[in-house]
Amino acid sequence: ISACLVGSEMCIRDRDSEIGRIRDAVQLPFQHRALFERYDLKPPKGVLLYGPPGNGKTMIAKAVANALCEGGYDSNGDGAISPAETHVKGVFLSVKGPELLNKYVGESERLIRLIFQRARERAANGNPVVVFIDEMDSLLRTRGSGVSSDVETTIVPQFLSELDGVESLDNVMVIGASNRVDMIDPAVLRPGRLDVKIRVGRPKTNQAIAIVDHYLTDDLPLEDGVDAHALSAVLVHDIYGTSERRHLCDVQEENGQWHALFLADVVSGAMLKNIVDRAKTRAVKESIETGLDVALTVPLLAAAVEDEYRETRDSMADVDPEQWSRINGMDPIRRIRTAE
Protein backbone atom coordinates (compact mmCIF):
# COMPACT_ATOMS: atom_id res chain seq x y z
CA ILE A 1 0.00 0.00 0.00
CA SER A 2 2.77 2.43 0.89
CA ALA A 3 4.10 2.30 -2.67
CA CYS A 4 0.70 3.41 -3.92
CA LEU A 5 0.79 6.58 -1.86
CA VAL A 6 2.84 8.21 -4.60
CA GLY A 7 -0.24 8.36 -6.75
CA SER A 8 -2.55 9.49 -3.97
CA GLU A 9 -3.12 12.80 -2.23
CA MET A 10 -0.14 13.19 0.05
CA CYS A 11 -2.05 14.30 3.11
CA ILE A 12 -1.21 10.80 4.38
CA ARG A 13 2.53 11.17 4.14
CA ASP A 14 4.57 9.86 7.07
CA ARG A 15 1.61 7.94 8.50
CA ASP A 16 3.67 4.75 8.76
CA SER A 17 1.81 3.42 11.81
CA GLU A 18 -1.65 3.74 10.24
CA ILE A 19 -0.44 2.41 6.87
CA GLY A 20 1.26 -0.55 8.57
CA ARG A 21 -1.90 -1.53 10.43
CA ILE A 22 -4.15 -1.30 7.39
CA ARG A 23 -1.58 -3.24 5.35
CA ASP A 24 -1.71 -6.02 7.94
CA ALA A 25 -5.50 -6.00 7.87
CA VAL A 26 -6.13 -5.67 4.13
CA GLN A 27 -3.07 -6.50 2.07
CA LEU A 28 -1.62 -9.50 3.95
CA PRO A 29 -4.77 -11.67 3.87
CA PHE A 30 -5.13 -11.18 0.12
CA GLN A 31 -1.46 -11.61 -0.76
CA HIS A 32 -0.74 -14.56 1.53
CA ARG A 33 -3.97 -16.49 1.64
CA ALA A 34 -2.25 -19.89 1.96
CA LEU A 35 -0.29 -18.79 5.01
CA PHE A 36 -3.44 -17.52 6.67
CA GLU A 37 -5.04 -20.92 6.05
CA ARG A 38 -1.93 -22.72 7.31
CA TYR A 39 -2.15 -20.88 10.61
CA ASP A 40 -5.95 -21.13 10.72
CA LEU A 41 -6.10 -17.34 10.82
CA LYS A 42 -9.28 -15.63 9.71
CA PRO A 43 -8.80 -12.22 8.07
CA PRO A 44 -10.83 -9.40 9.61
CA LYS A 45 -14.22 -8.72 8.09
CA GLY A 46 -13.78 -4.98 8.33
CA VAL A 47 -11.65 -1.99 9.22
CA LEU A 48 -12.80 1.32 10.68
CA LEU A 49 -10.77 4.47 10.03
CA TYR A 50 -11.79 7.16 12.48
CA GLY A 51 -10.58 10.49 13.77
CA PRO A 52 -10.98 14.25 13.30
CA PRO A 53 -11.98 15.49 9.83
CA GLY A 54 -9.49 16.46 7.15
CA ASN A 55 -6.66 14.12 8.13
CA GLY A 56 -6.56 11.58 5.35
CA LYS A 57 -8.99 8.76 6.17
CA THR A 58 -10.46 8.78 2.68
CA MET A 59 -6.99 9.17 1.17
CA ILE A 60 -5.79 6.06 2.98
CA ALA A 61 -8.76 4.21 1.51
CA LYS A 62 -7.76 5.49 -1.95
CA ALA A 63 -4.26 4.14 -1.37
CA VAL A 64 -5.84 0.76 -0.63
CA ALA A 65 -7.77 1.06 -3.90
CA ASN A 66 -4.57 1.79 -5.83
CA ALA A 67 -2.87 -1.22 -4.26
CA LEU A 68 -5.79 -3.47 -5.15
CA CYS A 69 -5.86 -2.23 -8.73
CA GLU A 70 -2.16 -2.96 -9.15
CA GLY A 71 -2.85 -6.63 -8.47
CA GLY A 72 -0.30 -9.14 -7.21
CA TYR A 73 -2.66 -11.39 -5.23
CA ASP A 74 -2.72 -15.11 -4.55
CA SER A 75 -5.75 -16.19 -6.56
CA ASN A 76 -5.51 -19.97 -6.06
CA GLY A 77 -4.53 -20.09 -2.40
CA ASP A 78 -1.18 -21.89 -2.86
CA GLY A 79 0.80 -18.93 -1.54
CA ALA A 80 2.76 -18.43 -4.76
CA ILE A 81 2.21 -15.47 -7.03
CA SER A 82 3.18 -16.37 -10.57
CA PRO A 83 3.63 -13.75 -13.32
CA ALA A 84 0.17 -14.62 -14.64
CA GLU A 85 -1.40 -14.33 -11.22
CA THR A 86 0.23 -10.97 -10.68
CA HIS A 87 -2.44 -9.60 -12.99
CA VAL A 88 -5.25 -10.72 -10.69
CA LYS A 89 -6.52 -7.33 -9.62
CA GLY A 90 -8.68 -6.34 -6.74
CA VAL A 91 -11.99 -4.50 -6.88
CA PHE A 92 -12.76 -1.38 -4.87
CA LEU A 93 -16.42 -0.47 -4.39
CA SER A 94 -16.85 2.98 -2.85
CA VAL A 95 -19.99 4.67 -1.53
CA LYS A 96 -20.78 7.57 0.78
CA GLY A 97 -23.09 6.78 3.67
CA PRO A 98 -25.63 9.56 2.93
CA GLU A 99 -26.01 8.27 -0.64
CA LEU A 100 -27.65 5.13 0.72
CA LEU A 101 -30.24 6.97 2.81
CA ASN A 102 -33.58 7.07 1.03
CA LYS A 103 -36.99 8.28 2.17
CA TYR A 104 -38.80 5.37 0.51
CA VAL A 105 -39.40 2.35 2.75
CA GLY A 106 -37.00 -0.50 2.02
CA GLU A 107 -34.97 1.38 -0.60
CA SER A 108 -31.91 1.93 1.61
CA GLU A 109 -31.88 -1.74 2.59
CA ARG A 110 -32.13 -2.72 -1.08
CA LEU A 111 -29.12 -0.55 -1.94
CA ILE A 112 -27.07 -2.18 0.82
CA ARG A 113 -28.03 -5.64 -0.44
CA LEU A 114 -27.08 -4.59 -3.98
CA ILE A 115 -23.62 -3.39 -2.92
CA PHE A 116 -22.82 -6.64 -1.13
CA GLN A 117 -24.30 -8.67 -3.97
CA ARG A 118 -21.90 -6.97 -6.39
CA ALA A 119 -19.03 -7.57 -3.99
CA ARG A 120 -19.82 -11.30 -3.75
CA GLU A 121 -20.13 -11.63 -7.53
CA ARG A 122 -16.70 -10.12 -8.10
CA ALA A 123 -15.14 -12.04 -5.23
CA ALA A 124 -16.46 -15.30 -6.73
CA ASN A 125 -14.10 -14.72 -9.67
CA GLY A 126 -11.09 -14.77 -7.36
CA ASN A 127 -10.74 -11.00 -7.11
CA PRO A 128 -10.19 -9.49 -3.67
CA VAL A 129 -12.94 -6.94 -3.03
CA VAL A 130 -12.99 -3.97 -0.68
CA VAL A 131 -16.29 -2.21 0.08
CA PHE A 132 -15.50 1.31 1.28
CA ILE A 133 -18.24 3.23 3.13
CA ASP A 134 -17.36 6.87 3.75
CA GLU A 135 -19.20 8.86 6.45
CA MET A 136 -20.31 5.59 8.03
CA ASP A 137 -21.77 7.37 11.06
CA SER A 138 -24.49 8.93 8.88
CA LEU A 139 -25.66 5.48 7.79
CA LEU A 140 -25.20 3.21 10.81
CA ARG A 141 -26.17 5.39 13.76
CA THR A 142 -26.80 3.98 17.23
CA ARG A 143 -30.32 2.62 17.49
CA GLY A 144 -32.48 3.94 20.32
CA SER A 145 -30.21 6.90 21.03
CA GLY A 146 -32.68 9.57 19.96
CA VAL A 147 -30.43 10.67 17.08
CA SER A 148 -31.40 7.94 14.66
CA SER A 149 -34.45 7.87 12.42
CA ASP A 150 -36.75 4.95 11.66
CA VAL A 151 -34.96 4.46 8.35
CA GLU A 152 -31.57 4.12 10.03
CA THR A 153 -32.83 1.63 12.62
CA THR A 154 -33.73 -0.78 9.84
CA ILE A 155 -30.48 -0.18 7.95
CA VAL A 156 -28.23 -1.38 10.79
CA PRO A 157 -29.80 -4.88 10.96
CA GLN A 158 -29.59 -5.15 7.17
CA PHE A 159 -25.90 -4.22 7.20
CA LEU A 160 -25.19 -6.71 10.01
CA SER A 161 -27.04 -9.47 8.19
CA GLU A 162 -24.80 -8.91 5.16
CA LEU A 163 -21.71 -9.24 7.36
CA ASP A 164 -22.91 -12.22 9.41
CA GLY A 165 -25.50 -13.82 7.15
CA VAL A 166 -25.72 -17.26 5.56
CA GLU A 167 -24.03 -16.00 2.39
CA SER A 168 -20.38 -15.74 3.37
CA LEU A 169 -18.22 -12.75 2.55
CA ASP A 170 -15.18 -14.72 1.42
CA ASN A 171 -12.59 -12.51 -0.25
CA VAL A 172 -14.56 -9.38 0.73
CA MET A 173 -13.56 -6.77 3.27
CA VAL A 174 -15.43 -3.68 4.48
CA ILE A 175 -13.59 -0.43 5.24
CA GLY A 176 -15.51 2.36 6.94
CA ALA A 177 -14.47 5.95 7.60
CA SER A 178 -16.03 8.23 10.20
CA ASN A 179 -15.42 11.48 12.05
CA ARG A 180 -17.93 10.46 14.74
CA VAL A 181 -17.22 6.91 15.87
CA ASP A 182 -19.32 7.62 18.98
CA MET A 183 -22.44 7.78 16.77
CA ILE A 184 -21.94 4.37 15.12
CA ASP A 185 -24.11 1.57 16.51
CA PRO A 186 -21.98 -0.53 18.92
CA ALA A 187 -23.19 -3.72 17.24
CA VAL A 188 -21.29 -2.72 14.10
CA LEU A 189 -18.05 -2.36 16.06
CA ARG A 190 -18.17 -5.69 17.90
CA PRO A 191 -15.40 -8.28 17.36
CA GLY A 192 -16.07 -10.34 14.27
CA ARG A 193 -17.42 -7.35 12.36
CA LEU A 194 -15.29 -4.23 12.07
CA ASP A 195 -12.44 -5.88 13.98
CA VAL A 196 -9.66 -3.41 13.25
CA LYS A 197 -10.08 0.18 14.40
CA ILE A 198 -7.41 2.65 13.28
CA ARG A 199 -7.35 6.21 14.56
CA VAL A 200 -6.11 8.72 12.00
CA GLY A 201 -5.16 11.67 14.16
CA ARG A 202 -3.85 15.15 13.53
CA PRO A 203 -0.44 15.42 11.87
CA LYS A 204 2.59 15.93 14.06
CA THR A 205 5.18 18.54 13.08
CA ASN A 206 7.26 16.26 10.85
CA GLN A 207 4.13 14.91 9.19
CA ALA A 208 2.86 18.44 8.61
CA ILE A 209 6.12 19.43 6.91
CA ALA A 210 5.85 16.39 4.63
CA ILE A 211 2.29 17.37 3.73
CA VAL A 212 3.22 20.98 2.96
CA ASP A 213 6.21 19.75 0.91
CA HIS A 214 3.70 18.23 -1.50
CA TYR A 215 2.10 21.62 -2.16
CA LEU A 216 5.20 23.84 -1.87
CA THR A 217 7.64 22.59 -4.49
CA ASP A 218 10.80 23.96 -6.10
CA ASP A 219 9.10 24.39 -9.48
CA LEU A 220 6.89 27.17 -8.06
CA PRO A 221 7.95 30.84 -8.26
CA LEU A 222 10.38 31.22 -5.34
CA GLU A 223 13.04 33.75 -4.45
CA ASP A 224 16.55 32.97 -5.72
CA GLY A 225 18.36 30.64 -3.38
CA VAL A 226 15.23 29.76 -1.41
CA ASP A 227 14.52 26.08 -0.85
CA ALA A 228 10.86 24.98 -0.91
CA HIS A 229 11.42 22.52 1.93
CA ALA A 230 12.83 25.30 4.10
CA LEU A 231 9.72 27.36 3.39
CA SER A 232 7.57 24.39 4.42
CA ALA A 233 9.43 24.11 7.71
CA VAL A 234 9.04 27.83 8.45
CA LEU A 235 5.33 27.68 7.65
CA VAL A 236 4.70 24.65 9.86
CA HIS A 237 6.65 26.01 12.82
CA ASP A 238 4.56 29.18 12.61
CA ILE A 239 1.35 27.14 12.65
CA TYR A 240 2.50 24.92 15.51
CA GLY A 241 3.69 27.75 17.73
CA THR A 242 2.14 27.96 21.19
CA SER A 243 2.62 31.65 21.85
CA GLU A 244 -0.18 34.16 22.39
CA ARG A 245 -0.22 35.01 18.67
CA ARG A 246 -1.60 31.53 17.87
CA HIS A 247 -3.91 31.25 20.90
CA LEU A 248 -7.50 30.50 19.84
CA CYS A 249 -9.40 30.33 23.12
CA ASP A 250 -9.55 28.68 26.53
CA VAL A 251 -11.64 25.54 27.02
CA GLN A 252 -13.08 23.97 30.16
CA GLU A 253 -13.06 20.19 30.36
CA GLU A 254 -15.64 18.10 32.20
CA ASN A 255 -13.44 17.99 35.30
CA GLY A 256 -13.65 21.79 35.50
CA GLN A 257 -10.04 22.40 34.47
CA TRP A 258 -9.32 25.19 31.99
CA HIS A 259 -6.54 25.06 29.42
CA ALA A 260 -5.45 27.03 26.39
CA LEU A 261 -6.29 25.91 22.86
CA PHE A 262 -3.91 26.84 20.03
CA LEU A 263 -4.09 26.63 16.26
CA ALA A 264 -1.84 23.56 16.44
CA ASP A 265 -4.55 21.75 18.43
CA VAL A 266 -7.03 21.91 15.55
CA VAL A 267 -4.70 21.66 12.54
CA SER A 268 -5.44 19.06 9.87
CA GLY A 269 -4.03 18.03 6.53
CA ALA A 270 -6.89 19.87 4.83
CA MET A 271 -6.10 23.04 6.80
CA LEU A 272 -2.43 22.88 5.78
CA LYS A 273 -3.40 22.65 2.12
CA ASN A 274 -5.83 25.53 2.56
CA ILE A 275 -3.11 27.76 4.07
CA VAL A 276 -0.76 27.07 1.16
CA ASP A 277 -3.60 27.77 -1.27
CA ARG A 278 -4.22 31.09 0.47
CA ALA A 279 -0.59 32.08 -0.08
CA LYS A 280 -0.71 31.00 -3.72
CA THR A 281 -3.90 33.00 -4.26
CA ARG A 282 -2.23 36.09 -2.82
CA ALA A 283 0.72 35.55 -5.15
CA VAL A 284 -1.58 35.17 -8.16
CA LYS A 285 -3.41 38.42 -7.35
CA GLU A 286 -0.16 40.32 -6.90
CA SER A 287 1.15 38.82 -10.15
CA ILE A 288 -1.94 40.09 -11.97
CA GLU A 289 -1.41 43.56 -10.54
CA THR A 290 2.31 43.74 -11.31
CA GLY A 291 2.44 41.70 -14.51
CA LEU A 292 5.30 39.64 -13.02
CA ASP A 293 5.56 36.27 -11.29
CA VAL A 294 5.43 37.10 -7.59
CA ALA A 295 7.52 34.72 -5.51
CA LEU A 296 6.10 32.75 -2.62
CA THR A 297 7.97 34.27 0.32
CA VAL A 298 8.01 33.85 4.08
CA PRO A 299 5.94 37.05 4.59
CA LEU A 300 3.37 35.83 2.06
CA LEU A 301 3.07 32.47 3.82
CA ALA A 302 2.93 34.14 7.23
CA ALA A 303 0.04 36.30 6.03
CA ALA A 304 -1.80 33.16 4.90
CA VAL A 305 -1.29 31.55 8.32
CA GLU A 306 -2.55 34.71 10.00
CA ASP A 307 -5.71 34.72 7.86
CA GLU A 308 -6.41 31.08 8.72
CA TYR A 309 -5.75 31.72 12.40
CA ARG A 310 -8.11 34.72 12.55
CA GLU A 311 -10.92 32.88 10.79
CA THR A 312 -10.55 29.86 13.08
CA ARG A 313 -10.35 32.02 16.21
CA ASP A 314 -13.42 34.06 15.26
CA SER A 315 -15.45 30.93 14.52
CA MET A 316 -14.85 29.61 18.05
CA ALA A 317 -17.23 32.20 19.49
CA ASP A 318 -20.24 30.60 17.80
CA VAL A 319 -19.69 26.86 18.25
CA ASP A 320 -21.48 24.48 20.59
CA PRO A 321 -18.65 23.23 22.88
CA GLU A 322 -19.85 19.65 23.28
CA GLN A 323 -20.66 19.10 19.63
CA TRP A 324 -17.48 20.85 18.45
CA SER A 325 -15.25 18.70 20.67
CA ARG A 326 -16.88 15.50 19.43
CA ILE A 327 -16.58 16.42 15.77
CA ASN A 328 -12.92 17.33 16.25
CA GLY A 329 -12.06 14.15 18.11
CA MET A 330 -11.29 15.82 21.45
CA ASP A 331 -12.19 15.13 25.05
CA PRO A 332 -15.60 16.55 26.00
CA ILE A 333 -15.62 20.33 26.51
CA ARG A 334 -18.11 22.13 28.75
CA ARG A 335 -17.35 25.76 27.94
CA ILE A 336 -15.30 27.86 25.54
CA ARG A 337 -13.89 31.22 26.59
CA THR A 338 -12.72 33.50 23.80
CA ALA A 339 -10.76 36.72 24.06
CA GLU A 340 -12.79 39.91 24.15
Where are the predicted features?
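Single conserved hydrophobic/aromatic residue that forms the stacking wall/gate
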Residues: 1-7, 12
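Conserved C-terminal "switch" segment of AAA+ ATPases
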Residues: 70-90, 167-170, 187, 201-271, ...
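Flexible beta-alpha connector loops of hexameric P-loop NTPases
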Residues: 79, 83-86, 97-110, 139-154, ...
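Pre-Walker A (pre-P-loop) alpha-helix and adjacent loop at the N terminus of AAA/AAA+ ATPase modules
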Residues: 13-45
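C-terminal engagement/docking regions of AAA+ P-loop ATPases
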Residues: 39, 173, 251-340
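Conserved alpha-helical scaffold flanking the Walker A/P-loop in AAA+ ATPase domains
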Residues: 79, 107-131, 154-166
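Conserved catalytic/switch belt of AAA+ P-loop NTPases
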Residues: 117, 133-196
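Walker A/P-loop
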Residues: 43-94, 117-122
